[in-house]
Amino acid sequence: MHFIAISINHRTADVALREQVTFRDDALRIAHEDLYETKSILENVILSTCNRTEVYAVVDQIHTGRYYIQRFLARAFGFEVDDIKAMSEVKVGDEAVEHLLRVTSGLDSIVLGETQILGQIRDAFFLAQSTGTTGTIFNHLFKQAITFAKRAHNETDIADNAVSVSYAAVELAKKVFGKLKSKQAIIIGAGEMSELSLLNLLGSGITDITVVNRTIENAMKLAAKHQVKYDELSSLPNLLESADIVISSTSAQSYIITNEMIERIAENRKQDSLVLIDIAVPRDIEPGISAITNIFNYDVDDLKGLVDANLRERQLAAATISEQIPTEIHAHNEWISMLGVVPVIRALREKAMAIQAETMDSIDRKLPGLSERERKIISKHTKSIINQMLKDPIKQAKELSSDKKSNEKLELFQNIFDIEAECPHEQAKQQKESKVKEISARRIFSFE
């Protein structure tokens, strides 16, 4: 069995392509089932977000499995197989494990160290598990990856430093006010950066937010989407008299907030602080306003300095997390190597205990007068003899797990003790056959 990961992400495909290869939430369960029923696939998890669509699979053969996954994606999104090959990257074995660990911990995200992907991986795994497309390997591996990512974030604080301009804008406001929950905010503009700033303000606890824009319809649309207030741009001077935070991001060719405007409203504001954050280029807010008492004016260069410093902190944290990944891969490989040994040890124990049970039956027939206490003593000691006899063979079997010729030697081990253990590959195939029948039955029932 082999682990393979096929990924379409922000490095391999531009946004125009990624938009075309995203599974809708309501289609993911069926997609899991369709892929699972495909030849060569023994286990699978599908991850689909705005920045990546990935298939993780346990396959019986690498080349066959890779082809059928690529064909599945091509059919799902209306592409040719060669198109999918061109827009994706393929990881196999240890590289696939490393990829999963990096994705889950946010090291492979557009925003380094972001935590949203951890929840998305967890949801994808839980969906696959509930659908029935995971088995022994993925049930262990994905739990390991999720645990690793949680620990990495807790130990390094990689997600604690803002690395987007809109998020950094809110962080600057926090430096002035501390908690923002009771503050009033104005968003000038209704584009993408304005919406991101609005979302970050909402995330900080602020609820009193007003969107203003030259085109009132756009302000109305953005405000309705996030359930905040809106107003005309001409109302800005009046709004500034009671505002605490202003974030401006428009494409205006002249200043929207001028020195004269701020000087006029400053008289009515008494000594209340006002934070003006200009993330527009060209600038929306006239330079020099910071000279007015209790007025804090920041532009994109101020934000860039904060973002750059925070990014360096995240990169240091990412390096620390990356150093831990080889240990996780080794732990996974150790666990995998034991999969072939466990059934052999189980078969050996079962045979030994069957011999002990036969021996006790023989003793019962030949010594029918034994008391229950005497019988328990004999049973206990015969089991003890068996455990002592099995101690060294079991130890040897475990050591075979790390041997390059473990399969051959485990087969010899079984021949010596005249036992027969089912290999993990056969178990996985039988498990798949059973689950495919369940999926088919579920679909028939759903159709009826």
UniProtKB/Swiss-Prot annotation:
Record's PROSITE patterns?
GLUTR
> Which residues participate directly in catalysis?
C50
Question: Do you know which CDD domains this protein is assigned to?
Answer: NAD_bind_Glutamyl_tRNA_reduct
Binding-site list for substrate: T49, C50, N51, R52, S109, E114, T115, Q116, Q120
Question: What InterPro entries does the entry give?
Answer: 4pyrrol_synth_GluRdtase, 4pyrrol_synth_GluRdtase_dimer, 4pyrrol_synth_GluRdtase_N, GluRdtase_CS, GluRdtase_dimer_dom_sf, GluRdtase_N_sf, NAD(P)-bd_dom_sf, Shikm_DH/Glu-tRNA_Rdtase
Q: Which residues of the sequence carry a binding annotation for NADP(+)?
A: G189, A190, G191, E192, M193, S194
One of the entry's Gene Ontology molecular-function terms is: NADP binding
| Marked site: Important for activity | H99
Q: In which pathway does it act?
A: Porphyrin-containing compound metabolism; protoporphyrin-IX biosynthesis; 5-aminolevulinate from L-glutamyl-tRNA(Glu): step 1/2
Query: What domain of life?
Result: Bacteria
| Top-tier EC class | oxidoreductase
State the reactions this protein catalyses: (S)-4-amino-5-oxopentanoate + tRNA(Glu) + NADP(+) = L-glutamyl-tRNA(Glu) + NADPH + H(+)
Please list the GO biological process terms of this entry: protoporphyrinogen IX biosynthetic process
| Keyword list, A-Z | NADP, Oxidoreductase, Porphyrin biosynthesis
Give the Enzyme Commission number.
1.2.1.70
Question: Looking at the keywords, is Transmembrane present?
Answer: no
Q: Which residues form the signal peptide?
A: none
| The protein's assembly and partners | Homodimer.
Supply the NCBIfam families for this chain: hemA (TIGR01035)
Q: What else is known?
A: During catalysis, the active site Cys acts as a nucleophile attacking the alpha-carbonyl group of tRNA-bound glutamate with the formation of a thioester intermediate between enzyme and glutamate, and the concomitant release of tRNA(Glu). The thioester intermediate is finally reduced by direct hydride transfer from NADPH, to form the product GSA.
Task of the protein: Catalyzes the NADPH-dependent reduction of glutamyl-tRNA(Glu) to glutamate 1-semialdehyde (GSA).
Q: Domains: what does the record tell us?
A: Possesses an unusual extended V-shaped dimeric structure with each monomer consisting of three distinct domains arranged along a curved 'spinal' alpha-helix. The N-terminal catalytic domain specifically recognizes the glutamate moiety of the substrate. The second domain is the NADPH-binding domain, and the third C-terminal domain is responsible for dimerization.
- Family statement drawn from the similarity comment of this UniProt entry: Belongs to the glutamyl-tRNA reductase family.
Name-wise, this protein is Glutamyl-tRNA reductase
Native source organism of the sequence: Staphylococcus aureus (strain NCTC 8325 / PS 47)
